[in-house]
Amino acid sequence: MVDILAAPQQTKADSALRTLTGISIAHWVSHFYIFVFPMLFPFLKEQLGVGYIELGFALTAFGLVSGLTQAPIGYLTDHFGARKVLLIGLAVGGCALIGLGLHLSYPALIVSAVVLGLANSVYHPADYAILSAHMDNARMGRAFSVHTFAGFLGGAVAPAIMLALVATVGGLGALIVAGAIGPLVALLLIAMGVPDTSAAERKAAGAEAPKQNIVTPAIMMLTIFFMLLGLSNAGISNFGIVALMSGYGVDLATANVALTAFLAASAIGVLAGGFLADRTHRHGQVAAAAFGINAVIMLVIAIASLPSPLLTALLTVAGFLGGVITPSRDMLVRNAAPPGAAGRAFGIVSTGFNFSGIFAPLLFGWIMDQHMPHWVFGASVVFMVLTVLLALVTERKPAQIPATA
């Protein structure tokens, strides 16, 4: 009898592990694709005879399209199935790169960036909808953390992979080979049997759509929360090296070590945060506490001249705490999403990250142009304080259960 009862549990556990593995691989592809164009900028500049402004416009097109289509793709995810949307996104994104490799021109680059941005918009709503439907609630935080870590890993290895491809098969070949990864991963997910969101959930979502207002105050606050998270991290990630070199007397090697420590600690923090998210229901307080400490750390960096070892140590702690809150951040969205609307909820709030990616380079670039490198960290403090306040406001209170006689 014990063996008969244990078999379904093992099968369910195996299915959950297979699902998490497949979705995490897809998220790896998402972040890998984000870095394909930037890694090929020297090749594209030489081949197309354009400047970095023209190449930057391709990234702007990617970001705008990805940001504006997240919410509509979330709607499609809830109504037609997350698995279908995810597979199409993988295939379309890959074909965008393959097409550019077969016919390289500046107009083709812009078209490819637009299509790649559209494909990129599927991952968050589709991935989180599948994970929310098929992961054990007791391990949901850890599932979200592994999924996020896989994305971090995709971005981390992209430079090495693209450089190796350019060295072996050239720039055009690198585009084609990188593009082939998307369709191949789509076939892998089919072979692995990654499940869809259930037909019952989609039917319920469709039946309730006219009555259901997904754009709730909590979802809108979380969208702003995501944007503030992006803004608070973007200055450090993108302008941290130049700020440390110009304002703190730090050499390039030391600045690189400090930023690498910050990013590596963030990835480790994501995994640790998954265990924490599964052991508490107070996800907003976890996020607020971690970012509150980070705000103090960044304030110290902004106003004090610190020795390089201490500066690196503080950035390492800040990176770890920034990673720790990520699973709790995702749990806040899941808790705020109405039943059957996880795809739409994650699609809407993820636009906050996309728009922070548009605004942050302008803001922090202006700060550096004004020769105020300390304000790269000072502005991050402001955004972190606002993030702390929103984390506390947006935490959804558990419903009160009426007492029974």
Across the structure, where does each feature detected by a protein language model lie?
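Helix-loop-helix hairpin linking two adjacent transmembrane segments in secondary transporters
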Residues: 147-193
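Structural signature of the two symmetry-related core transmembrane helices
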Residues: 84-98, 285-300
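Cytoplasmic helix-loop-helix junction between adjacent transmembrane helices
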Residues: 112-150
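Residue-level signature of mid-helix packing/kink "hotspots" within the transmembrane helices
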Residues: 35, 63-71, 155-156, 263-267, ...
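Juxtamembrane intracellular "pre-TM" segments in multi-pass secondary transporters
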Residues: 2-14, 196-222
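Extracytoplasmic gate region of multi-pass secondary transporters
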Residues: 37-38, 218-263, 267
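Helix-to-loop junctions at the C-terminal end of transmembrane segments
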Residues: 69-81, 270-282, 368
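Conserved MFS/SLC helix-loop-helix module at the cytosolic interface between two early adjacent transmembrane helices
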Residues: 68-104
